[in-house]
């Protein structure tokens, strides 16, 4: 058994760690609330944009935009959104597992894959995973702007425009609630048709003045908005996961301190008992 001094040092060390994890929990909770506000503000726009674009994909258009044409999936691109930092539980691991499983299916079907990573963790993982990483962005902070993502997204759009990609997906952790974050893979290109059951009829649009100019701008904005929403959702998921992880670490530290305190008390008791025995033995010898 370790002596009382060593145990006391361990207790102090765990208490210091507990203070750090408790502070990180409070910081994550504050950041999560702010991230939730940003997510709630941008989610209606992203969802309605996807719905409108889904109707466009079902419509009979005067001008057939390349983003509406379904091609054989010989090369597939993934825009993978992860965190820059760790200490957020299994958030990134679960996301990467989902991507790897989907990539395996694509490769079994004979397709090649290409990645665009947003977040330092995804860049580290996919650079070692195998497959081409065409673009990367990291260090966006807790409140990124759409302008911070445009350059990275454009790399994948240009690859699609040039026929180097036949499918494009965005992958991120969708914020469900504080305890639940779900990794999702959403198709960006070719444009997915609307899954809204309310609209069973065809949507026909009249574009003024020029359908090509309008669609060229609108469809690019759609892709950018979906990626931005994925980034915002992922940030909220990151802070929620970190808050939960730090709370668990703080609670575990408390339990460990309690266990160490019991060991310390036993060590102190043993030391005192030994001292008393030595005193009694010495007195008897005299």
UniProtKB/Swiss-Prot annotation:
Keyword Hydrolase (UniProt): no
Gene Ontology terms, MF aspect: ATP binding; proton-transporting ATP synthase activity, rotational mechanism
InterPro entries attached to this UniProt entry: ATP_synth_F1_ATPase_gsu, ATP_synth_F1_gsu, ATP_synth_F1_gsu_CS
GO cellular component: plasma membrane; proton-transporting ATP synthase complex
The keyword Membrane is assigned to this record: yes
Membrane topology per record: Peripheral membrane protein
One Pfam short name: ATP-synt
Cell compartment(s), UniProt: Cell inner membrane
Assigned protein family: Belongs to the ATPase gamma chain family.
Protein role: Produces ATP from ADP in the presence of a proton gradient across the membrane. The gamma chain is believed to be important in regulating ATPase activity and the flow of protons through the CF(0) complex.
NCBIfam families, sorted: ATPsyn_F1gamma, PRK05621.1-1
Subunit structure, interactors included: F-type ATPases have 2 components, CF(1) - the catalytic core - and CF(0) - the membrane proton channel. CF(1) has five subunits: alpha(3), beta(3), gamma(1), delta(1), epsilon(1). CF(0) has three main subunits: a, b and c.
Identification of the protein by name: ATP synthase gamma chain
Organism: Shewanella pealeana (strain ATCC 700345 / ANG-SQ1)
């Amino acid at each position: 058994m370790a002596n009382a001094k060593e145990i006391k040092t361990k207790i102090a060390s765990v208490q210091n760690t507990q203070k750090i994890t408790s502070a990180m929990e409070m910081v994550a909770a504050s950041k999560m609330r702010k991230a939730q506000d940003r997510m709630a503000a941008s989610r209606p726009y992203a969802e309605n944009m996807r719905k409108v674009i889904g109707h466009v994909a079902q419509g009979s258009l005067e001008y057939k935009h390349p983003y509406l044409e379904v091609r054989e999936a010989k090369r597939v691109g993934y825009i993978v959104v992860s965190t820059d930092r760790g200490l957020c539980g299994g958030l990134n691991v679960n996301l990467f597992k989902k991507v790897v499983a989907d990539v395996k299916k694509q490769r079994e079907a004979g397709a090649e894959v290409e990645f665009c990573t947003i977040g330092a963790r995804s860049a580290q993982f996919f650079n070692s995973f195998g497959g081409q990483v065409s673009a990367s962005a990291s260090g966006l902070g807790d409140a990124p702007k759409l302008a911070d993502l445009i350059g990275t997204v454009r790399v994948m759009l240009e690859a699609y425009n040039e026929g180097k990609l036949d499918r494009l997906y965005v992958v991120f952790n969708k914020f469900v609630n504080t305890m639940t974050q779900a990794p999702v893979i959403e198709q960006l290109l070719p444009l997915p048709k609307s899954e809204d059951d309310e609209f069973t009829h065809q949507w026909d649009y009249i574009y003024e003045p020029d359908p090509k100019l309008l669609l060229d701008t609108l469809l690019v904005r759609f892709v950018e908005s979906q990626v931005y929403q994925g980034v915002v959702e992922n940030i909220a998921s990151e802070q929620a996961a970190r808050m939960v992880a730090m709370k668990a670490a703080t609670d575990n530290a408390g339990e460990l301190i309690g266990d160490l305190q019991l060991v310390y008390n036993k060590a102190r008791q043993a030391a005192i008992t030994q001292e008393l025995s030595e005193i009694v033995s010495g007195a008897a010898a005299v």
